[in-house]
C-alpha cells in the first residue's frame, strides 16, 4: 500500500474514533438504566441519560423511588454518563 493510501486509512480511522460514541460498556451501570419517574406525583424536572440516543434528556421525576439514573443538572448527567 502506498504512503498516500496509508495516510487516508489513518485519517479515516481517526475520524471514525472521534465520531463514535463512547461504548456503553465504559459507562457506569446507572447510565444504562431506563428513566424511572417513580410512583409519586411531585412532577420535578430532572435529567436522565438516554442510552439509546446517547445523550442526557429531561424527564419529570415524581419525587420518590425511581432509580439512580436521575440528575439535578444536565452537567451532572453529562459528567457521569456522556464522558
Curated annotation (Swiss-Prot):
It is found in: Secreted. Residues 1-24 form the signal peptide. InterPro entries: Kunitz_BPTI (IPR002223), Kunitz_BPTI_sf (IPR036880), Prtase_inh_Kunz-CS (IPR020901), TFPI/VKTCI-like (IPR050098). Disulfide bonds join 31-81, 40-64, 56-77. Keywords: Disulfide bond, Protease inhibitor, Secreted, Serine protease inhibitor, Signal. Expressed by the venom gland. The record marks 41-42 as: Reactive bond for trypsin. Serine protease inhibitor. Belongs to the venom Kunitz-type family. This is Kunitz-type serine protease inhibitor vestiginin-7.
